[in-house]
From Swiss-Prot:
Name of the protein: Polyribonucleotide nucleotidyltransferase
Stored Pfam families: KH_1, PNPase, RNase_PH, RNase_PH_C, S1
Record lineage: Bacteria, Pseudomonadati, Chlamydiota, Chlamydiia, Chlamydiales
Predominant localisation class: cytoplasm
Gene transcribed to yield this protein: pnp
Annotated localization: Cytoplasm
Keywords, comma-separated and alphabetical: Cytoplasm, Magnesium, Metal-binding, Nucleotidyltransferase, RNA-binding, Transferase
């Protein structure tokens, strides 16, 4: 393919440039996207499956090369390897944006790889990666139903900003990443400072205009240079197979839907599927293959569940479309933790635990912008027993990382300022039961665990997951969706916030986009559900506890002049190590001169403060100090009046009477009250014990 390029101007100094035909020419699709000096490369390749499967094997891997910012990793291994949390989150963004664009029953193994090759420290690469991956797929042989594009939207100084720079985003009240087609939204994810539903909708509408512009340009490029799409890899569903399977299960599945609990429904559904396979799969007839029959069974189940909701307004567990499952809350739960809560909503349960600590407990990370440390972080755990299964235990999967980060963002906006609450805060959400909306249960349980731990949050936060049944030109929004509604429905729209406004949201859909009107309805219904949950939460715990747990460390801060930081640290860290050893406290010094002191007892904190004040304090002429004799000479004694500051008390200044032998008067290590008489031009201190006797 010859070198081809096009560009899309979004705003001043924000022009997307797409290039292909120069790099990675053997890939099915390869595109380099540039904006200023941030360049992101994306490739798309597909392989035929040796055996048909009942799902789409689609994999996205996004990687930020340290070399793109002129850096290498600070770790021992300098080669990029295991993806960072941020790389996993961006990979998920790309995956969730692109997945709805593929035809149903596409039997290809598809891989999209995205690399940040150049990063200018200003232009953020994730929306470029979404657009680049979409463009690479668009010009490849991989079949798609639609072209997609992605953008980021910020709210800076009351104005919407498209693809905000890093500096703009730091000042923004909104961080929204969204993807869609030229006419509809496919994916949104973001967090914000208590924006209203109307403001979020306005932001989405603003971003959609730019998405449409990019989609139109990619589509024109596809028509001009794109490869022929391989739609032969898309399996058709024979109409008679779907009809036979639907007729076979109609009455049986209607009976299964009468079961109101997850376990009974799943068991009945499993037995029914086994019966369908045993009775309808025909080895001699490829139309009635195992793959086709299983796919038809899933479609028939979905259609029957939808019909129940559309015709009767009743869901599989007997609820109405706006009804929220029963909620129970127990806090505190665990006796020795700093804060805990057991939050149960229907058959979804989160045991949330809050742990408070000093600076050494901060979550360290490294990315293209350098090293950093998170003051607050939430870790989500999803063990296999939560769904009654046997599975692997180990490092977290992409789903766990994504769910944890969403809940973390939802709660981060209500945390107090560090100056008011200097603790590092770790939240963990242990999912002990799951039947849908576990990430939103993590928000609710996590909020209550924070309050139980005495974290003075600005307001309680609750979360709810909304679903959608879209058929016959009728859109039905479901509040607090269960697992089967997530699996068989058209949308999973999670919204978290306070009574005042929204703090985080995430939407994934399985159809080719939804309209502004549907999102408006979903957000309005989510607000009602959120208010209901917040009311139940505040009935149990109306406000944060006034003090932290007796088992939590005590933390105090003090401010020193930045010129004294080196004095406190000492050569090779000698002084600060001595402070830690002598006080038993953990001491952390920030570049701005703020010192955090953490210890299990107040005595340790006081001792550390005393030692630091001694190092940083200035001696005053005329002031009396209770010093320590550090050495003895024939002409006098040297006395340390403050840590690191000592002076000479001449033999004539030791007593009103004549002192013949200093060793008979004082010993090394003795405490000796001395008065500072003067400081000479060399900074040497002249001390007198005799003057204290006169006083």
């Amino acid at each position: 393919m010859a070198f081809e390029t096009f560009s899309v101007a979004l705003d001043k100094d924000k022009t997307l440039i797409f290039e292909t035909g120069k790099i990675a020419r053997q890939a099915s699709g390869a595109v380099l996207v540039k904006m200023n000096e941030t360049w992101v490369f994306s490739s798309a390749c597909a392989a035929s499956l040796s055996e048909a499967v009942g799902f789409l094997p689609f994999r996205v891997d996004y990687q930020e090369k340290f070399s793109s910012a002129g850096r290498t990793s600070g770790g021992f291994l300098k080669r990029e390897g295991r993806p960072s949390e941020r790389e996993i989150l961006v990979s998920r963004l790309i995956d969730r944006s692109l997945r709805p664009s593929f035809p149903n029953r596409l039997m290809q193994d598809i891989q999209v790889l995205s690399y940040v090759w150049s990063y200018d420290g200003k232009t953020l690469p994730d929306p470029l990666a979404i657009c680049g991956a979409s463009a690479a797929l668009a010009i490849s042989e991989v079949p798609q139903n639609c072209i997609i594009a992605g953008v980021r939207v910020g709210l800076v100084g009351g104005k919407w900003v498209i693809n905000p720079t890093r500096d703009e985003l730091s000042a923004s009240k909104l961080d929204l990443v969204m993807a869609g087609t030229a006419s509809a939204v496919l994916m949104i994810e973001g967090h914000c400072d208590f924006l209203t539903e109307e403001q979020v909708l306005e932001a989405i509408a603003f971003g959609q205009t730019y998405i449409a512009k990019i989609c139109d340009a990619i589509e024109a490029w596809q028509k001009a240079i794109g490869k022929q799409k391989n739609f032969s890899a898309v399996l058709d569903m024979p109409e008679d197979v779907q009809n036979v399977v639907s007729d076979f299960i109609r009455e049986k599945f209607e009976k299964a839907l009468s079961f109101r609990d997850k376990e009974a429904l799943e068991q009945a559904s499993k037995e029914l599927e086994e019966s369908v396979i045993a009775n309808l799969v025909q080895e001699e007839n490829s139309d009635f293959s195992l793959l086709n029959v299983k796919a038809a069974f899933k479609t028939a189940k979905s259609n029957q569940m939808r019909a129940l909701i559309q015709d009767l307004g009743i869901r599989v567990d007997g609820r109405t479309t706006t009804e929220i499952r029963p909620i129970s809350i127990e806090t505190p739960l665990l006796p020795r933790t700093h804060g805990s809560c057991l939050f149960t909503r229907g058959e979804t349960q989160s045991m949330a635990v809050c742990t408070l600590g000093g600076e050494n407990m901060a979550q360290r990370f490294e990315d293209l912008n350098g090293d950093g440390a998170a003051r607050f972080y939430l870790q989500y755990f999803f063990p296999p027993f939560s769904v009654g299964e046997v599975g692997r235990i180990g490092s977290p999967g992409r789903r766990e990382i994504g769910h944890g980060k969403l809940a973390e963002k939802a709660l981060s906006h209500v945390l107090p300022e560090t100056s008011r609450f200097p603790y590092i805060i770790r939240l963990e959400s242990n999912i002990t039961e799951s039947n849908g909306s576990s990430s939103m249960a993590s928000v609710c349980g996590g909020c209550l665990a924070l309050m139980d731990a005495g974290v003075p949050i600005k307001a309680p936060v609750a979360g709810i997951a909304m679903g959608l049944i879209l058929d016959r030109d009728q859109a039905i929004i479901l509040s607090d969706i269960s697992g089967i509604e997530d699996h068989l429905g058209d949308m999973d729209f999670k919204v978290a916030g306070t009574a005042k406004g929204i703090t985080a949201f995430q939407m994934d859909i399985k159809i080719e986009g939804i309209t502004h009107k549907i999102m408006e309805q979903a957000l309005a219904q989510a607000k009602q559900g959120r208010s209901h949950i917040l009311n139940l939460m505040t009935q149990v715990l109306a406000s944060p506890k006034g003090t932290v747990s007796k088992y939590a460390p005590r933390i105090e801060t003090m401010q020193i002049n930045t010129s004294k930081i080196a004095t406190v640290i000492g050569p090779g860290g000698k002084q600060i190590r001595q402070i830690i050893e002598r006080s038993g406290a953990q001491v952390d010094i920030n570049d701005d001169g703020v010192i955090n002191i953490a210890a299990s007892t107040q005595e340790s904190i006081n001792k550390a403060k005393e030692l630091i004040e001694g190092l940083t304090g200035e001696v005053e002429v005329g002031k009396v100090y209770n010093g320590r004799v550090t050495s003895i000479a024939t002409f006098g004694v040297f006395v340390e009046v403050l840590p690191g500051k000592e002076g000479l008390c001449h033999i004539s200044e030791l007593s009103k009477q004549k002192v013949d032998n200093i060793s008979d008067f004082v010993k090394e290590g003795d405490k000796l009250a001395v008065k500072l008489l003067s400081i000479n031009e060399k900074g040497q201190l002249k001390l007198s014990h005799k003057a204290t006797l006169e006083d």
